[in-house]
């Protein structure tokens, strides 16, 4: 029986737009953005930011050097937020439903301070939550959040999954991991967690409920 659900952020809760992010960084002057940016796991200074090895200020300085001009904090944030196509209202509704039904909800994400400055603000769900007309940050919808830059490890490193399972003191066999990255799903499954692989931008809410109902039925077999 599933008691806890661990969600990825980008590609699950938030619809990712990798192409738009590339376009924005190219506009900032990063001509090779298409070869530098990755949909799942960043490398170079982008990866250093997401694993907590570089601060936002260090990232800004490095990006300025790569672009050949001074890049501001707001421009860095604008570039990163190119990834955030939208947050479907149905996803917010589903998170609230799952918590009402007693599931412990956890977010585990390869992300960075620029993205989380938006995600943790009321802009995250403004206009999407009828109970929060002014909007609420992502932490309002989860019991715990683990950004890669705070944990200092990125998926698909198994240590990320092990850290969350240990910190939350949850049984992997009673935990469902939801992620749009096949490699992340593959590694997470080795911990004993159940897994669900939705497709970025496709409605996963009803398939998830179907999966959870099947898990409940297994208990009674």
Stretches with model-predicted labels:
Residues 1-3, 7, 112-113, 117-221:
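Asp-based, Mg2+/Mn2+-dependent phosphohydrolase catalytic module
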Residues 23, 93-96, 163, 186:
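Surface-exposed charge patches
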Residues 109:
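Conserved phosphate-coupling serine/threonine residues in phosphotransfer and NTP-handling enzymes
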Residues 101-102, 141:
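Structured helix-beta-strand junction loops
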Residues 104-106, 194:
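Proline-centered loop/turn at the N-terminus of a beta-strand
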Residues 99-100, 189:
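Anion (oxyanion) recognition and catalysis
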Residues 2-93, 100-101, 112-116:
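N-terminal helical cap/lid subdomain that shapes the substrate entry/recognition surface
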């Amino acid at each position: 029986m599933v008691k806890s659900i661990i969600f990825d952020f980008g590609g699950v809760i938030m619809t990712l737009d990798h192409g738009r992010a590339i376009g924005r960084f190219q506009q900032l002057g990063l001509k090779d953005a298409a070869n530098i940016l990755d949909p799942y796991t960043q490398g170079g200074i982008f990866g250093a930011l997401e694993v907590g090895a570089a601060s936002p200020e260090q990232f800004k300085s490095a990006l300025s050097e790569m672009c050949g001009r001074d890049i501001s904090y707001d421009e860095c944030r604008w570039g990163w937020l190119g990834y955030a196509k939208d947050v479907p209202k149905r996803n917010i509704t589903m998170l609230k439903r799952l918590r009402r039904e007693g599931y412990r909800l956890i977010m585990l994400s390869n992300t960075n301070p620029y993205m989380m400055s938006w995600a943790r603000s009321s802009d995250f769900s403004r206009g999407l939550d009828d109970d929060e007309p002014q909007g609420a940050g992502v932490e309002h919808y989860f019991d715990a959040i683990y950004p890669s830059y705070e944990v200092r490890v990125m998926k698909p490193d198994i240590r990320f999954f092990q850290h969350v399972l240990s910190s939350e003191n949850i049984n992997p066999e009673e935990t469902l991991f939801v992620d749009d990255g096949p490699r992340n799903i593959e590694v997470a499954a080795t911990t004993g967690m159940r897994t669900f692989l939705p497709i970025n931008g496709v409605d996963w809410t009803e398939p998830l409920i179907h999966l959870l109902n099947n898990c409940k039925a297994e208990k009674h077999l």
